[in-house]
Amino acid sequence: MIFFERYEILFNKFNRSYLTSFGVFFPGLTILFSLILYNLGDSSFSIFTHYLSHLGIGPNGSNIIFNVGSMISGVVMVCFFLNLSVFLIKKEVSIILVNLSFIFGFISSVGIFMMGLFPGDISQYLHNFGAGFFFFGGLAYCILYGISEWTAKGISKLQALSGFVVAFPFLVFIYFTNINFFNHELALEISHFSEWILFTLLMCWIIGHEFSMKKDRRLT
């Protein structure tokens, strides 16, 4: 509780609104620019044949944009989860539930940072380790933040349900990726495609929550 209070005091000294608004769009912009650069160098890229992290080993500078962007995004996401946690505490959500949600958000953010720090052509093992942090942490925080918002005062049930909606593609991706571990050809296209669906829905969830928090700050 004291940690979140000190964070709120620190960032109230800055114009946090502009910083966080840019931050939540940063991961999506990173992917977009990486995709453009990749396709300028190799037009074979497809959401059915490539994972997101293939951008980290791509041509034409797409790898640099993706990997540096991933590391910055990891830091940005920690700030997002801090903001969301402070927001929920003000809505009288259980501090234990908020702490658990933030812990898994932090774990997922570390995973994003690691995926940028260790692209597949440097260390596939460490890259996969970071990916595991991101996906399993993401599944957990979507569920936990969803439960937190369901119990919060002044937050719509629709917003709370969005966490469970995003948790579902996490499960789908993890399921098909595990199938591919044992049979590489059985569900490869579905695994690739489900990750892109997951990323799209997750970005919508993050941006939607940022706008919700901004709206709440204007009303208070």
Q: Locations of the language-model features?
A:
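Alpha-helical transmembrane segments and their helix-start/interface "positive-inside/aromatic belt" motifs
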Residues: 8-28, 154-161
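Alpha-helical transmembrane segments of multi-pass membrane proteins
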Residues: 24-45
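Interfacial helix-start motif at the membrane-water boundary
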Residues: 54-75
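Cytoplasmic juxtamembrane regions at transmembrane-helix boundaries
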Residues: 82-107
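Membrane-proximal helix-loop-helix units in multi-pass membrane proteins
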Residues: 105-150
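Terminal transmembrane helical module of multi-pass membrane proteins
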Residues: 144-220
